[in-house]
Amino acid sequence: MAPVSNQVGGHVAVLAFPFSTHAAPLLNIVCRLAAAAPSTLFSFFNTKQSNSSILAGNTSVLRYSNVSVCEVADGVPEGYVFVGKPQEDIELFMKAAPDNFRRCLEASVAESGREVSCLVTDAFFWFGVHMADDMGGVPWVPFWTAGPASLSAHVHTDLIRSTTSGGCHDEKETITVIAGMSKVRPQDLPEGIIFGNLESLFSRMLHQMGQMPPLATAVFINSFEELDPVITNDLKSKFKRFLNVGPLDLLEPPASAATTTPQTAAEAVAGDGCLSWLDEQKVASVVYVSFGSVTRPSPEELMALAEALEASRVPFLWSLRDNLKNRQLDEFLSKGKLNGMVVPWAPQPQVLAHGSVGAFVTHCGWNSVLESVAGGVPLICRPFFGDQKLNARMVEDVWKIGLRLEGGVFTKNGMLKSLDMLLSQDKGTKMKNKINTLKQFAKQAVEPKGSSARNFESLLEMTTTN
């Protein structure tokens, strides 16, 4: 992509949501935009803790002189004692976020001498539309970090609440009133739509957020149009612009801010070692296991998974965070009888793109699902929270590129059945064929004339030419 040369003095303010895995993909996109528009200043606002996490071991972002990484307060009052309430840290942050971001933006404008010309935010920041208006009506361009199905669910929250029973009367009830969601059941939806405490600050925030995308200059997402054409077309009809710009890991040039980076030297060594180990394995023979950076399966489920891997004798690569280990699991994994490799961290996009990997055991976070599609690797899904159950439903019943665990949790027998079905049966072969078709669509989408490449050009133009 040729750099944009006519951008002089533009200033794009980028507001990141500092929880879960929201901030890293947004910084990824900022670096791509910055590379293509070197005269535009990009100010990336995030909490100190989140910035430290996503920049640890990855200083390549610093090579962009037009990207300024800034800190915003986390909203926790001095001397505050956490009481253990669900989403307590998120609620504190969100209560203070509008004022904290405004103060940071004023300081950034004063320091740079450039007024903000475009506001890019995480889509969770529903107040972005008001901030953009207060800046003289600059474009507001929110980024949805999950998939199109979950965005559609939030946009249609009121319709869902008024037309479904929430599965209370019929467990097989599906959501037929929303385009592309006829296989989805109410119980698959993220908390805060029809389940959970709908009056909590977080649920009310999600509800407000779902009402704002039609007011945005554009909404962009890490996906590609060919994956969910029905949902994509429906959202296009409701938004001013809806831009699928992924999969980010396939876009050229390569991202300078990876969605996952090793946090320590030991993790970096482990990452290099597991790729060398994969080079020695047979094609499509390895089961890759990872639950991301946030999800915490129970000790009982982790033991059941380990026992199934041992009994199956299939080669496996398990990216297992140290904070998930316990004495029993550690002793089991140290017996030396397992036909695999356990590492504290793995370079997931590269692992899933490796020809020896034949299955992915995952929590079904959106980044993981999309990386699996880009690598052409079928999934075994054990979702936990957020959009993960919805993603798992799409994987199994809509795209037919994987399966959910029997009973919804890890058991030794259930996991063995899933491995056998995916690796040894005709159904698994069909899943592999379907995901390879999607993989080709994904590659075509990021080619120079592909849908995602064109959408990225549109995103670049609307964020840097004002």
Swiss-Prot record:
GO terms (BP aspect): anthocyanin-containing compound biosynthetic process
Active-site annotation: 22 (proton acceptor), 122 (charge relay)
pH dependence: Optimum pH is 7-8 with pelargonidin and cyanidin as substrates.
Coiled-coil segments on the chain, per record: none
Pfam families tied to this protein: UDPGT
Keyword vocabulary terms for this entry: Glycosyltransferase, Transferase
Chemical reaction(s) catalysed: an anthocyanidin + UDP-alpha-D-glucose + H(+) = an anthocyanidin 3-O-beta-D-glucoside + UDP; cyanidin + UDP-alpha-D-glucose = cyanidin 3-O-beta-D-glucoside + UDP + H(+); pelargonidin + UDP-alpha-D-glucose = pelargonidin 3-O-beta-D-glucoside + UDP; peonidin + UDP-alpha-D-glucose = peonidin 3-O-beta-D-glucoside + UDP
Keyword hit for Transferase: yes
Binding site for UDP-alpha-D-glucose: 145, 346, 348, 363, 366-368, 371, 387-388
Keyword Transferase: yes
EC number: 2.4.1.115, 2.4.1.91
Gene3D superfamilies reported in the protein's UniProt record: Glycogen Phosphorylase B (3.40.50.2000)
Summary of the function given for this chain in its UniProt record: In the presence of other necessary color factors, this glycosylation reaction allows the accumulation of anthocyanin pigments. Uses UDP-Glc as a sugar donor, but not UDP-Gal or UDP-GlcUA. Anthocyanidins are the preferred substrates in vivo, but flavonols can also be glucosylated in vitro.
Protein's recorded name: Anthocyanidin 3-O-glucosyltransferase 1
